[in-house]
Design a protein with these regions (language model features):
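Hydrophobic core segments of alpha-helical transmembrane domains in multi-pass membrane transport
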Residues: 32-45, 77-81, 138-148, 162-173, ...
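C-terminal ends of transmembrane helices
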Residues: 44-53, 94-99, 141-154, 257-263
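Membrane-interfacial helix-loop connectors
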Residues: 81-84, 92-118, 124-133, 144-145, ...
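Non-transmembrane accessory domains of multi-pass membrane transporters/channels
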Residues: 323, 330-414
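Transmembrane alpha-helical segments and their short flanking loops
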Residues: 170, 177, 181-193, 230-236, ...
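Helix-loop-helix hairpins and the membrane-proximal interhelical loops
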Residues: 24-70, 160-206, 224, 234-235
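Alpha-helical transmembrane segments of multi-pass membrane proteins, especially transporters
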Residues: 57, 61, 65, 69, ...
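Short, Lys/Arg-enriched N-terminal segments with co-localized hydrophobic residues
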Residues: 4, 8-22
Length: 414
């Protein structure tokens, strides 16, 4: 009896110890993944901010010049986003220019189409295998930013430093994901996601809504898909399983943009809606051709063991998806404008004789070029009002008709 109780206690302690080890391992994976994701997002945001400091004004000039037709607008949007590594920054610039009257809504929408292509550059960069050089890159970036006297050179150093952090985050996420390959529960879950495209779209959308960055969730997807299955060669997820999640990531980022446009100008809302239509229509189109699309990507991408090339394949799928949808929608840009104008109409006409500011918009105060243009338009509007008031005053003085004074006073109080 005593021996049986001893065995039971030993077994119970063993089970408790195993359960504690399992929980510790799971917590390490969760916090490692979250920590790696945090480093990645911080590095990406820092790199974007530094690039905007170094080249932001030049990119604004390019945007203003290359928007005479939709094709040039697409090129300008893609180039600006690729350089700044931020589709949000490009979108904000475009909205600011529309509000200031520097470009039309179709031109702004074409820039958004280009921004969708430019943002795929992040995924292409992530697909490079530079894990052996991460700490060298971080060190070089730190030294340049630490010893530089010029603000521009310091921004370049910080950009290099942030670039290294971005890959450090990716490397951290990859390291903590490796134990998941041996988990039967997790592999069964992944098999379900891989075989049900709609579920993959839902997972991708939810991930982007939570993280608030499609570049970050696509980086997680690339990293996760690069984890080997039981045979050590094939991907846990596979390209056909990754594409629906990729489509969901694209939908998630449009919902984020829609939420961000609440309380903004009508043009900001129209731009967000156009972005939403672009990605949702793409998802609805591509979801029916996941396997043929995956086969095409595998054909045009580098060959090799799946776990080594799938990150590049996902990046290529992301790029080809956005290029295809841009080619479709740039031909239908007038139709897109009609849709967004119908969904968000102009409403009542602007009262140009109002005593309150008409063109000033504090939402674009951080864009000096666009804000100054709005100030100039407001000054011209008020100048016209002053000219009318002065002319009416001179008429009243000459005619001595005091009955004309009351309408003039009312005009000044509007």
């Amino acid at each position: 009896m005593f021996e049986r109780n001893c065995r039971r206690q030993v077994l119970q302690k063993t089970n408790e110890g195993e359960w504690e080890n399992i929980m510790n391992e799971k917590l390490q994976i969760i916090f490692g993944l979250l920590g790696g994701l945090a480093v990645f997002i911080y590095g990406m945001n820092m790199m974007s901010e530094c690039l905007q400091k170094a080249a932001g004004e030049k990119m604004k000039s390019i945007l203003a010049l290359l928007t005479k037709n939709p094709v040039l607008g697409v090129i300008a949007g893609a180039l600006t986003t690729a350089v700044l590594q931020s589709s949000s920054a490009t979108t904000v610039m475009a909205i600011g220019f529309v509000s200031a009257g520097l470009m039309s809504l179709p031109q702004a929408i074409s820039i958004i189409f280009g921004a969708n292509i430019g943002t795929t550059m992040t995924a292409q960069i992530i697909a490079f295998k530079i894990s052996d050089y991460i700490y060298i890159i971080i060190f070089i970036g730190f030294i340049i930013s630490f010893i530089a006297k010029s603000e521009k050179v310091k921004s370049i150093g910080q950009t290099i430093f942030a670039f290294g952090l971005l890959f450090l985050g990716i490397e951290t996420m990859g390291d903590v994901m490796k134990p998941l390959a041996s988990s039967p529960v997790f592999t069964n879950l992944i098999e379900r996601v891989a075989h049900i495209p709609v579920l993959g779209v839902f997972v991708g959308t939810l991930m982007t809504l939570v993280v608030q960055s499609s570049s970050a969730t696509i980086a997680v997807l690339q990293n996760f898909a690069s984890q080997p299955g039981p045979d050590g060669v094939t991907s846990m997820l596979g390209l056909a399983g990754a594409i629906p999640i990729l489509l969901g990531d694209n939908i998630g980022t449009t919902i984020t943009a829609l939420l961000a446009s609440i309380g903004q100008t009508k043009d900001a809302k129209r731009t967000a809606v156009a972005h939403c239509i672009f990605n949702i229509s793409g998802c609805l189109l591509f979801i029916w051709f996941v396997k043929p699309f995956a086969a095409l990507i595998q054909h045009i991408s580098p060959k090799g063991p799946e776990v080594e090339v799938i990150s590049r394949q996902i990046a290529n799928a992301h790029t080809l998806f956005n290029i295809t949808m841009t080619l479709i929608w740039v031909c239908l840009i007038k139709f897109m404008v009609k849709i967004v104008m119908t969904l968000i109409p102009d409403g009542k006409a602007v009262d140009m004789d109002s005593a309150k500011p008409v063109f000033l918009d504090d939402k674009i105060i951080n864009q000096p070029a666009a804000a100054l243009q709005l100030v100039a338009k407001e000054i011209l509007r008020v100048s016209e009002m002053v000219k009318v008031v002065v002319a009416d005053t001179i008429t009243i003085v000459k005619t001595e008709d005091m009955n004309e004074l009351e309408p003039l006073q009312e005009k000044g109080l509007q």
